[in-house]
Amino acid sequence: MDCVLRSYLLLAFGFLICLFLFCLVVFIWFVYKQILFRTTAQSNEARHNHSTVV
């Protein structure tokens, strides 16, 4: 019984680790997309301001 319980705990622990890694990857991808979008928006805005000044 102890061996079965240990295998179940190991399976649950592995599932939690996979879930945590998946959430981490999604969070990093979301933050990277936000930063990328913000930098492109700033560059477009700077280019627009530069064209209006000239």
UniProtKB/Swiss-Prot annotation:
The protein's job, in short, is:
Transports viral genome to neighboring plant cells directly through plasmosdesmata, without any budding. The movement protein allows efficient cell to cell propagation, by bypassing the host cell wall barrier. Two movement proteins, p6, Hsp70h and three structural proteins, CP, CPm, and P64 are essential for cell-cell movement. Also plays a role in virion formation. Together with CPm and p64, encapsidates the 5'-terminal portion of the viral genome.
Q: What is the effect of changing R6A?
A: Strong reduction of virus ability to move from cell to cell
Q: What is the effect of changing K33A?
A: Reduces virus ability to move from cell to cell
Per the record, the GO terms for biological process are: transport of virus in host, cell to cell
What does the annotation give as the result of altering D2A? Strong reduction of virus ability to move from cell to cell
State the source organism's domain of life: Viruses
InterPro entries (UniProt xref): Beet_yellows_virus_p6
Positions on the Lumenal side per record topology: 1-10
**Where is it mainly found?**
host cell
Asked if the Swiss-Prot or TrEMBL record annotates the protein with the keyword Lipid biosynthesis, the reply is: no
Q: Is Transmembrane helix set as a keyword in this record? A: yes
Q: Which Pfam families match?
A: MP_p6
Can you say what this protein is called? Movement protein p6
GO CC, any one term:
membrane
What changing V54A does, per the record, is: Reduces virus ability to move from cell to cell
Summarizing the annotation, the consequence of altering E45A is: Reduces virus ability to move from cell to cell
**Cytoplasmic face residues:** 32-54
Q: Which UniProt keywords apply?
A: Disulfide bond, Host endoplasmic reticulum, Host membrane, Membrane, Transmembrane, Transmembrane helix, Transport, Viral movement protein
User: Which residues does UniProt call coiled coil?
Assistant: none
> Which regions span the lipid bilayer?
11-31
> What species is this protein from?
Beet yellows virus (isolate Ukraine)
